[in-house]
């Protein structure tokens, strides 16, 4: 069955390349390029897109790497790139034409972060800029004119779980913990001091849900549902998404929360 785009439930929705092409001249639609390196953006980007690197979102905190910056800092970043809560923003990434890298998680990291810190209308470009380019759609090297905004950021606690809360929840019968890391890392071959996984966590690598040739493109709904049924993930359970640094988990968090409409 054909989808009506934007597709999804709530604060994050998915759009396809046809939809974005039809809305490319819409002044009330922001495009946010999150390719891995600024030189990827400089070399080529979707017309009208502003660049923002996911590396700005997290820094060390008291020795712990990859901790989100405060809401005050995030607010400054959001204002500088011109984000406005009333205007939808399409987020996309791809294999950078300069860096030659990009695994697709750039756009799920950014989508999750935007919502966590106060945006309510985020669109993810299914297939990313790679699909856009494969279809020979327009690209540019021109930078758009951007006015700073007055975005007010807040760190929404409902989109994260703290360590002590997690320990209290993880063994409950109505809770399922997903481990989004690759299988070999789940099995103990990762770089961590304590290799392995959280006892009871179910390993569903984030790439399981994505097209094998383009990890920015979701598999069909039928394939996604088959994976969910295989692992007995049901909407009557609280799903906690986990990984190593919180990056891989964003792919499954936005998928279950807003694509599949899990509570």
Label each region the model flagged:
Residues 2-7, 68-168, 189, 247-263:
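Thiolate-centered catalytic microenvironments shared by cysteine-dependent enzyme domains
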Residues 4-86, 94-98, 169-235:
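Positively charged, proline/Ser/Thr-rich regional signature most characteristic
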Residues 243:
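Short cysteine clusters
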